[in-house]
């Protein structure tokens, strides 16, 4: 691998850390960069998980120090996410990405329309929506459903978690993003363990990228905390549009 390719990967890792810390979707930058460098898809996914687990943990710590974390959801969902994502990573070899991409594209378009048509969504918390049944639903959706998807494919996991917690629990975007980071740690760890046992992780490269991912994540989390829910909403819509575009290109190009 050339020096230029290494520099591109490090820059992509920093950008991915920033995006992941704000709304998720950093894989949009990291995964293509890894594959353009000539790394096979499975190894690229595995190395992406290694880098991301450090950045996501950094973002989570930054959020926890400055905002309220929904521990009633984050802790059980995060624990379940380790198992669910691991199962997803195991199933990844049997499920074609071509089958999942159109479904994910439709869901992302629905998310974009939903957020666009509801400008007040996620701007302020709505605690009156919270019930025990909704807490259980949020844990199941985040810790099982979305986590399993992250193990199989991944794009949009953080975004899906934020939308789920905002819609189901009435959290604002900043608190939803903070809570999502804990589940994201679980999904990254679960998938990383499976990929590591299968020998797909490029450890030296992944750890080098992790340093830049940490820097980007720290900056992204601080910006989200400083600029608030409106900033997170704008970045979320931009990232969703970018994800739909990339998935469409992969599917139809």
PLM features per residue range, with description:
Residues 58-68, 89, 106-131, 242-253:
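Transmembrane helix exit motif
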Residues 6, 49, 104-108, 112, ...:
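Residues within membrane-spanning alpha-helices of integral membrane proteins
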Residues 46-106, 188-238:
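Selective hydrophobic functional segments
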Residues 10, 14, 18, 49, ...:
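Residue-level signature of the transmembrane alpha-helical core
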Residues 39-48, 72-76, 170-181:
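Membrane-interface alpha-helices at helix entry/exit sites of multi-pass transporters
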Residues 87, 91, 143-153, 191-199, ...:
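Hydrophobic alpha-helical transmembrane segments in multi-pass integral membrane proteins
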Residues 1-40, 126-177:
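Selected transmembrane alpha-helices and immediately adjacent juxtamembrane segments
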